[in-house]
Swiss-Prot record:
GO biological process, one term: regulation of nitrogen utilization
Example of a GO MF term: ATP binding
Gene Ontology terms: cellular component: cytosol
Listed Gene3D superfamilies: 3.30.70.120
Protein source organism: Methanococcus maripaludis (strain DSM 14266 / JCM 13030 / NBRC 101832 / S2 / LL)
Name used for this protein in its record: Nitrogen fixation nifHD region glnB-like protein 1
Protein family: Belongs to the P(II) protein family.
This protein's encoding gene: glnBI
Length: 105
């Protein structure tokens, strides 16, 4: 299994969530976060924003689905401008459902 953490623009988050749901990935966690990338913030007129609001989507998928999910997120969140986001992928050894105490997705 893979954990996918996608940090995207808040304005694109619902579009990404909807695209994931349409592809069958309905289980995810969505969080509002604040951060910055390589460009270290943004300056608009005389105001400098050190950190910018983003939305983080976290989901766990089977290994064979990870590449398609990453492609879907990348395609849907893309604007072509700085700040489109980042996707992090990590291995997941096990996942447990609290209610049923079952292991796996």
């Amino acid at each position: 299994m893979k954990m996918i953490r996608a940090v995207v623009r808040p304005s694109k988050a619902e579009e990404v969530v909807d695209a994931l749901a349409e592809s069958g990935c309905v289980a995810l966690t969505k969080m509002d976060v604040i951060g910055r990338g390589k460009q270290k913030g943004i300056k608009i007129d005389q105001i400098y924003y050190d950190e910018l609001p983003k939305t983080m989507l976290m989901l766990v998928v089977e290994d064979d689905a990870a590449e398609n999910v990453i492609e879907l997120i990348t395609k849907t969140a893309y604007t072509g401008s700085f700040g489109d986001g980042k996707i992090f992928v990590s291995p997941v050894d096990e996942a447990y459902t609290v209610r049923t105490r079952s292991c796996g997705l």
